[in-house]
């Protein structure tokens, strides 16, 4: 991965674009890889849900600055549009992080809602939603007990505070925010309808075997994911 990123940076330098380009590195979600005795990714523990984001823009953004605010993947499009001085997307909840980073703005006077959500909704499992608000994080699994963590004091998420009465206030506040505009039963019904539509299309594809010139067919030796 480092080599391929290096090729992109070399191409920018070769074309004299390296000093006038905003570079954003962002990954997909993580994997549990045994943390909390779990594998794969369908949880909201930090190893699964948290992703790195690195921005580099010579002359515009300071080197080595680290944000302590809570940001979301939704903020990426708003940040790129802000960098282009383009209008924000309509109905987008994304927020540009440039006011928090640029020395000329230095974050002064920026009103930043220190909150982010993540969801996992399918037709074959309970609907999940997570909220991160400041140092607090609540994992909501519909029909199951919630989990509450203070990431400042417990970054490894080993001490579930949802069972402690001292934290009932913050727990109820976060549960209310989770349910604001989010109905797990309605979402489950929507996902079942989508699955029915998918099954029709999948059946058609199996029976007709349409030519797909855009499909990337892996060689047997490359298809290692399920081995």
Enumerate the predicted regions with their spans.
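Short, solvent-exposed loop/turn segments at the edges of secondary structure
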Residues: 46-50, 92, 126, 133, ...
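Non-transmembrane alpha-helical segments in soluble domains
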Residues: 2-9, 13, 77-81, 85, ...
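Long, internal low-complexity/basic segments
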Residues: 163-227
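Polar, surface-exposed loop/tail segments
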Residues: 19-21, 63-129, 167, 172-176, ...
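Beta-strand elements within well-structured catalytic alpha/beta cores of enzymes
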Residues: 1, 5, 22-27, 53-55, ...
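Histidine-centered active-site microenvironments of extracellular/periplasmic hydrolases
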Residues: 10-62, 69-72
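Active-site beta-strand termini and strand-to-loop segments that position acidic
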Residues: 57, 131-134, 141, 151
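Short catalytic/ligand-binding loop motif for oxyanion handling, primarily in non-cytosolic enzymes
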Residues: 31-35, 41-42, 62, 100, ...
């Amino acid at each position: 991965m480092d080599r391929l990123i290096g090729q992109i940076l070399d191409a920018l330098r070769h074309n004299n674009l390296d000093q006038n380009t905003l570079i954003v590195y962002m990954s997909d979600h993580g994997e549990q890889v045994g943390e909390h005795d779990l594998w794969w990714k369908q949880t909201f523990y930090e190893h699964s849900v948290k992703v790195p984001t690195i921005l580099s823009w010579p002359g515009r953004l300071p080197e080595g600055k680290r944000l302590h605010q809570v940001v979301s993947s939704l903020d990426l499009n708003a940040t790129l549009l802000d960098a282009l001085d383009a209008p924000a997307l309509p109905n987008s909840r994304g927020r540009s992080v440039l006011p928090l980073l640029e020395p000329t703005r230095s974050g002064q006077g920026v009103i930043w809602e220190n909150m982010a959500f993540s969801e996992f909704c399918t037709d074959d499992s309970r609907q999940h939603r997570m909220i991160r608000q400041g140092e607090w994080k609540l994992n909501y699994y519909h029909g199951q007990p919630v989990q509450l963590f203070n990431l400042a004091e417990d970054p490894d998420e080993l001490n579930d505070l949802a069972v402690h009465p001292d934290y009932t206030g913050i727990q109820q506040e976060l549960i209310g925010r989770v349910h604001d505009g989010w109905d797990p039963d309605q979402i489950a019904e929507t996902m079942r309808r989508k699955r029915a539509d998918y099954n029709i299309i999948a059946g058609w594809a199996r029976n007709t075997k349409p030519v797909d010139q855009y499909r990337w067919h892996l060689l047997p030796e490359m298809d290692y994911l399920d081995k």
